[in-house]
Amino acid sequence: MSAPLVIVDRLVKQFGDGDTAVTVLKGLDLTLEVGEFVALLGPSGSGKSTLLSILGTLMRPTEGRLTMLGEPLVDADDVQLTEFRNRHIGFVFQAHHLLPDFTALENTIFPAATHRGRETDADRERGTALLDRVGLSDRRDFLAAKLSGGQKQRVAVARSLMNSPELVLADEPTGNLDRESADQVMDLLVEINRADGTAFLISTHDERIAGRCKRQIRMLDGRLVDA
């Protein structure tokens, strides 16, 4: 059996100091296996987005340990975290965060081009293949501002895969979409997980969306109540 993809041990996140301090995460323990497809459920304010930010190395915990792919990350410096994030983690957000004046292809290859400092022919080939995979080959040269909401989110999915990550963190990826578009995005995530073995942790309020995941974990008041 392979080693876990992610191990979280007694994770605490506190904002502020002294009497005004707010503890958002309260001693979380969590393990994600390679290739898992997991829903993270919980009400607003329960700590879901904070947990995803820490798992994505966008935020440091106050206490606890985070190990991913066997590498301890809590004591890594910013340069090491950026390198690790670019190589191993993809992101899909509720707001797509596409650059409106970039084409669908330019947005897709942005993570690779930014990391390297320039885009290559290989980047364009991979970006084109990813857009074809998400059903947008005919929108490759459209500006993001000209795409529908569902199309923008599919570009965001393609972008999250550009660097072939082992883990994609999706924070309410269907939250701004109608039911049909939400189902199309989830169809993509399910197929990518099945075909590539990419692990997904999907934060959602929607029990219907969560039901399509192979495992559900729940947060309440900064704690995992069902992991």
Question: What residues fall within each predicted segment?
Answer:
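ABC family nucleotide-binding domain
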Residues: 4-212, 216-219
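Conserved switch/coupling elements of ABC/ABC-like ATPase nucleotide-binding domains
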Residues: 221-227
